[in-house]
Amino acid sequence: MVVRKKKKSRKLRGRTRSMGWGRIGQHRKSGARGGFGAVGFHKHKWIWVLKYAPNWYGKHGFTRPPETIYGVYSINVGELDELAKHLVSKNLAYREEGKIVIDVTSMGFNKVLGRGKVTLPLKIITKSISKRAREKITAVGGEVVVIGEKQQ
């Protein structure tokens, strides 16, 4: 587009009360831009709304109730392996048939991921588990119990 008017310099010319902006108050506060923020969207800024924000007004979409939204709270098998003996001493886990049984759902987690090394035979009780985590646990003689999944 062709520039019709040279932009006024932002520099404070002359260090006077108005700094080149005419009457005192012409360049002060929000009167020069039609109000703070979204003021005037239904009045003097309506054309701007139609052009740049056509979906500003009206209802859009649906908000799910918070109780139906479940977050993924995950822990890695490497962390469980490191914490296993500590969890037994704190009575958050127990030993059964040579394995350390850890119920991650009682600790607030709902998924087990596969990062880290597994050195101890663990029996993990969880709501969901990644393929890699399951492989690592069973490779050292461990066991995985997924809540809601049929046992073979």
UniProtKB/Swiss-Prot annotation:
PANTHER family xref list: 60S RIBOSOMAL PROTEIN L27A, LARGE RIBOSOMAL SUBUNIT PROTEIN UL15
Family per record: Belongs to the universal ribosomal protein uL15 family.
Protein name as catalogued: Large ribosomal subunit protein uL15
SUPFAM superfamilies in the record: Ribosomal proteins L15p and L18e
Entry keyword annotation includes rRNA-binding: yes
Keyword annotations from UniProtKB, A to Z: Ribonucleoprotein, Ribosomal protein, RNA-binding, rRNA-binding
Gene Ontology BP, a term: translation
Domain of life: Archaea
Subunit organization: Part of the 50S ribosomal subunit.
GO cellular component, one term: cytosolic large ribosomal subunit
Chain's role: Binds to the 23S rRNA.
Coiled coil start-end: none
Record-level Gene Ontology MF annotations: rRNA binding; structural constituent of ribosome
Gene3D superfamilies reported for this sequence: 3.100.10.10, 4.10.990.10
